[in-house]
UniProtKB/Swiss-Prot annotation:
Function: Catalyzes the reversible adenylation of nicotinate mononucleotide (NaMN) to nicotinic acid adenine dinucleotide (NaAD).
Keyword annotations: ATP-binding, NAD, Nucleotide-binding, Nucleotidyltransferase, Pyridine nucleotide biosynthesis, Transferase
Disulfide bonds: none
Pathway: Cofactor biosynthesis; NAD(+) biosynthesis; deamido-NAD(+) from nicotinate D-ribonucleotide: step 1/1
Chain segments annotated as coiled-coil in the UniProt record: none
Phylogenetic placement of the source organism: Bacteria, Pseudomonadati, Pseudomonadota, Gammaproteobacteria, Aeromonadales
Family from the record: Belongs to the NadD family.
GO MF assignments: ATP binding; nicotinate-nucleotide adenylyltransferase activity
Signal peptide: none
Pfam families, A to Z: CTP_transf_like
Cross-referenced Gene3D superfamilies: HUPs
Name of the featured protein: Probable nicotinate-nucleotide adenylyltransferase
Length: 214
């Protein structure tokens, strides 16, 4: 018998904010996920180097997890000295959790660029994909992504409990137009980040003097 599925949310988290956390909370509640694992990247393959150090980003992720029941921090990617490829993390987790469905959480922007990911066609061998979709948005799917959805999309949340991997579930979420880039701009301008990220994270940023304008 399979255990309850868990959610996996990777990212640079520079800093972690409600645009990361709110969709994860929604997915946890909609799918009955046993936990959400926050997995900070060390060297993100598709992004520029982070503004903050790994230690600072980890500290912020720990603070955010402490404020959200059922959220835990997985540090494995920070301990690598090579790019943080999702497939490597999923393969390691599958070996550790052979009876637990894995739900990898991502935004629609990530799904649309999935064919550029390292070994992207193998991801669904190890996890389900849970994709945050802005209500009313009808994306123009690239051919490879459209074909992937045709084979793997489900609207049955319980299906993610019955199989270890292989489904794609599109989650309707509250529209949150916030990116880490925009948040860093607000912080650099000295604006109040209240309600855009956990209070403990905002306090840490202020105490450490992070994201200030040069």
């Amino acid at each position: 018998m399979l255990k309850a599925p868990i959610g996996l949310l990777g990212g640079t988290f520079d800093p972690i904010h409600i645009g990361h956390l709110r969709p994860a909370i929604d997915a946890r509640d909609a799918l009955g996920l046993a936990e959400i694992r926050l997995i900070p990247n060390h060297i993100p393959p598709h992004k520029a180097n982070p503004f903050c150090s790994s230690e600072q980003r980890l500290a912020m992720v720990r603070l955010a997890a402490a404020e959200n029941p059922g959220f835990v921090v997985d540090e494995r990617e920070l301990k690598r000295d090579k790019p943080s490829y999702t497939i490597d993390t999923l393969m390691a987790l599958r070996e550790e959790l052979p009876d637990t469905p894995l739900c990898f959480l991502m935004g629609m922007d990530s799904l649309l660029t999935l064919p550029s990911w390292h070994r992207w066609q193998a991801l669904l061998d190890y996890a389900h994909l849970v994709v945050s979709v802005r209500p009313g948005w009808q994306p123009d799917y690239p051919t490879k992504v459209a074909e992937l959805l045709a084979r793997h999309h489900t609207t049955d949340a319980t299906a993610l409990h019955r199989r270890l991997a292989g489904h794609i579930w599109l989650a309707d979420n509250l529209p949150i137009a916030l990116s880490a880039t925009r948040l860093r701009e607000l912080l650099a301008a000295g604006q109040d980040p209240r309600y855009l990220l956990p209070a403990s994270v905002a306090d840490y940023i202020r105490q450490q003097g992070l994201y200030q304008a040069d």
